[in-house]
Amino acid sequence: MRGYDGAPPRRAKYLRDALHGSIVVEPHEIPFVDAPLFQRLRGILQTGPVYLTYPSARHSRFEHALGVLHLAGRMVARLADLAHPSLPAEHRRAVRLAGLLHDIGHGVFSHSSEKVMVATPLLAAQLDPALPGHQPHEKVGALLLRSAPLRRLFEQADVDADAVVALITGDHAGVRAHGLPPYLAGVISGPIDADKLDYFARDSLFSGVPAILDYDRLLQSLAIGEPGIQLSMAGAGELEKLLFNRITMYHALYNHHKVQTADCMIQGAVEAIVGPAFGAAPASDGLLAVVADSPEGSAQTLDFRRVIDFLRLSDEALLHAPSGDPYVSDVLQRLRTRRLLQRAFVLQRDTVAAIDDDTYLDFAEAVRRSADLVRQRIFERLRESVPTLHPGDVWVRPSVVPRVSDTDVIATTPGDATRHPTIFSGWNPDLADRRVTNPVQRNYLLYKAPIYVFAPPDHLAVAERAATSVLREQFDCLLPRVTFVPRPRG
């Protein structure tokens, strides 16, 4: 963070936010906000390519992080009123900073590039090995928070950096080991945490997909449980409404077919640079991009062989970065002009004949688990008819199933060990683990979670034939002769 001294001002700052109104940033928090590692989040969109379908959804992770700071402060203030003894000031500071910094590890186009990071051994080996099961941005964030420049700011704020990492990752044991009550981990990472409360309402506001959330009712219902946060019965209805609206948002927003195809194309561009699918050679000329904080202020060649490269580009910089590789250059230009891949085939309950619901769910889950292999086989079949096709032109993309777990947090009285289930009780985040029993989740998977096959607009019919033949061969499943092939459209 060259040229940045990190000196805290004497007074707090008041920021205006479209969602929360006034947000107070305390003096010791301002150096973190001003740090280049945090300021770069202005260039990382909160919802990635969603703006190509919902034009106003151009809010950034910078704004979201400030919103989580605000809500974490409100939540910890409520919990402090309930705690005996009350929470000391340093614990409150740690929770607020965890809210502010929880997304600091996000790179260019966030989750789109993370998929490549996980699938590339060279990159995966650079992530924090002490956080198995966590997402790449959390592992990168942990490394950044423990780096020398940010450690100096933590020391200046009298906050333990490792405690903040434990809060962000929801590590109850780690939070306790650093002297904080373990329930505080639920403020940042839990069923009703500040992160979810902000991104749900913020994504709704800026996308135009309506959803009403009563923050005051939820916060007034907070209670301290063991080991995490509970809600009183007064908050039960609000929690169920939140969870229901979240599921609706997944179907309408995050899993929209245009959003998913744009996400695939971004992933394909990064994949082509790092090391494309199916063993093809990486783009030989790399990706040339201007990096604002380069020592000489000149262009640098980024080949995404290091995790740090993902932090050096904004979303817009990636889309406009020149590349010597024809495929990379073409796909970025198509993203800029919204000339996207389209649906060649949609697998959902009404496109599979002569099987019952349980058999369909098993079949769909088998396709989800082997989506990469199915993609490769469809591509190989399609190449027989279209030899010029690139691996990045064909995708098998299952809808993302929202995680609605650990929702049985309703207690009759604060601290009551008896939990009362919501209508989402039994929602199973691991679909391969056991048969789905929650009726809401079951219907979601049957009717609201299609599996898409995307292909170039000029090759939809042949791609549909390739997809159906591969699925019949691999899964021995009878598909109807006529399946949904959309007419080409923007």
Segments from the language model and where they lie:
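Histidine-centered, transition-metal-coordinating active-site segments
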Residues: M1-L97, H106-G490
